[in-house]
Curated annotation (Swiss-Prot):
Species annotation: Neurospora crassa (strain ATCC 24698 / 74-OR23-1A / CBS 708.71 / DSM 1257 / FGSC 987)
UniProt protein name: NADH-ubiquinone oxidoreductase 24 kDa subunit, mitochondrial
Matches recorded under Pfam families: 2Fe-2S_thioredx
Residues that bind [2Fe-2S] cluster: C143, C148, C186, C190
Record EC number: 7.1.1.2
Gene3D superfamilies: Glutaredoxin (3.40.30.10), NADH-quinone oxidoreductase subunit E (1.10.10.1590)
Cofactor: [2Fe-2S] cluster
GO molecular function: 2 iron, 2 sulfur cluster binding; metal ion binding; NADH dehydrogenase (ubiquinone) activity
Reactions it catalyzes: a ubiquinone + NADH + 5 H(+)(in) = a ubiquinol + NAD(+) + 4 H(+)(out)
Entry keywords, A to Z: 2Fe-2S, Electron transport, Iron, Iron-sulfur, Membrane, Metal-binding, Mitochondrion, Mitochondrion inner membrane, NAD, Oxidoreductase, Respiratory chain, Transit peptide, Translocase, Transport, Ubiquinone
Bias (Polar residues): 233-251
Places the protein is found: Mitochondrion inner membrane
Amino acid sequence: MATKLTPFLMRTAVRAATRLSTKPSTIAPVSRACLSISARRPSDTLMVHRNTPDNNPDIPFKFSADNEKVIEEIIKRYPPQYKKAAVMPLLDLGQRQHGFCSISVMNEVARLLEMPPMRVYEVASFYTMYNRTPVGKFHVQACTTTPCQLGGCGSDVIVKAIKEHLGIKQGETTPDGLFTFIEVECLGACANAPMVQINDDYFEDLTPETIKQVLSALKESVTDVSKAPQPGPQSGRQTCENAAGLTSLTSEPYGPEVTRSDL
């Protein structure tokens, strides 16, 4: 049956195509889908290393004497045959000493842990906390995930305030080398949204005014450490307590409970 139908279907299709080709087209042109492409994340922009004057294998790197002692303690935590498991803390240590996780830092970590350099590169290129390009003294990372977009004044307003105050766009560093700004995904402080991580500190419950105050204070702290801003909520609340204040566990705590009264 299928064999008999095939010639018929082919003839029908050819005739239909011929008619369409001889008549003016009445079919509306198909519009191309408009794709929305977000800005490239700095963590995605360097999946392959490219030598630069400030980041190439010819630049020597060695851990300081103090960090060598720290490395000895770190490696002791792992069995000798599995010391390569220390790759992440050693990369972090190298980044803190050098300012960023350069190719020379990765090669030195590979040498110390006796593992192929490519394995170290894989780790450093996978985790976004390793900065494989130079960053400023203050690495400003604004969370733009849903809770921060919806919480408080919203992360869009915070991002705009940062860009205006620093005069840079995402992924850029200020001319004085003090600030690098990027947008990141959730940093786990959703109850205190919107928030920003700067180096190792969280600044939460932000408004355009408070984030500008934080950035100004950080700049002043370069010459006067006492000017450094206090991390945490900038709204005055304690950690992540309810905005309405304490609503539970308001009474004095009971004493330790025991199973037997004679204990």
